[in-house]
Amino acid sequence: MLGKIITEHGQVVNNKDIMVVHLHLKEGETIPAHNHPGRQIFFTVVEGEVEVYLDEKETYPLVPKKVLEFDGEARISVKALKESDIFVYLVVKR
């Protein structure tokens, strides 16, 4: 089989180059501030709406068809404004 359809949640890919995390957040649910040193982050909402906070200084509203890219050194926290499905791609910087 050449492809794999990913439907589970949590860390769905984790190798030396990339980690992919699939999350489901209920409305009002939050992810506390944290960072990912050594990674470039691509954060995308598949369904729903969230606010992403970087270093507690910048706020990014995200909905489907939008991708937020940022350096993993920044501290990220998240709040789900609606029930949301999210994919986060953490790429090792070289």
Located regions from the model:
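Short beta-strand segments in beta-sandwich/barrel cores
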Residues: 21, 30-31, 48-53, 67
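Short histidine-centered beta-strand/loop micro-motifs
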Residues: 23, 31-36, 54, 79-80
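Short acidic-glycine-tyrosine-enriched beta hairpin
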Residues: 56-73
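A short glycine-rich, His/Asp/Glu-containing loop-to-beta-strand
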Residues: 2-32
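Ligand-binding loop in jelly-roll beta-barrel domains
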Residues: 72-94
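Short, surface-exposed secondary-structure edge patches
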Residues: 22, 42, 57-60
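A cytosolic small-molecule/anion-sensing beta-strand core signal
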Residues: 46-47, 63, 82
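Glycine- and acidic-residue-biased ligand/ion/polar-headgroup-sensing regions
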Residues: 38-50, 55
